[in-house]
Amino acid sequence: MKKLLVVLAFAPVLASAQVPSSPSLGIAEGRCRAGEPGSAFLINVVGLKDRGGTMKAELYPANDNDFLADDNILINAGKTFRRVVIDVPSSGNVQLCIRAPSAGTYGLSLLHDRDGNRKFGLSIDGVGFGSNPQSLGPFKPKIAVGRVTAGAGVTPVNVRMLYRRGLMSFGPIK
């Protein structure tokens, strides 16, 4: 009975500690700032299908359980999650800078949200990962396709975008 009372007493505190869901989760932590020291990735996006919509980069812990996991769950567990979103420029190179907590290995994913609805559209949108896989099947990718290693400063990485090809596979545009 005492344990139940203790749990009930702390329930409001525990509930208030949860981070509410929002598209802005991880953005403040992920944004690069001019002259700021620390680890970051400068992502050069290649192989875009078109210049519409937005480009979203997300950084995850480097393990299969946390890679592409729900941002709320990661943040509430105190795990790495960073996000950067930009409008795709009408011309020129498409680059995003995303900060990492420190030098080390992470999982990196990109979404070309061509219709700008902030959701992945299987038949419309493109995806990219840090290790540049040649193709993707219909299943959730493992960390091996997204693994990148940050140095102490800014680490450049090229990411090739993949778009739906055929019924359930993704590959680069031709």
Features from the language model and the residues they span:
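Extracellular beta-sheet/turn segments enriched in Thr/Pro/Gly and aliphatic residues
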Residues: 19-33, 136-167
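A short, amphipathic beta-strand motif
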Residues: 41-47, 57
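Acidic, glycine-anchored loop motifs typical of Ca2+
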Residues: 113-122
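Sec-dependent N-terminal signal peptides
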Residues: 4-13
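Beta-strand signatures of extracellular beta-sandwich domains
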Residues: 56-60, 107-109
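Tryptophan-paired
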Residues: 71-100
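A short tyrosine-centered beta-strand micro-motif
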Residues: 94, 101-110
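Short solvent-exposed strand-capping/beta-turn motif centered on an Asx-Ser/Thr pair
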Residues: 46-50, 101-103
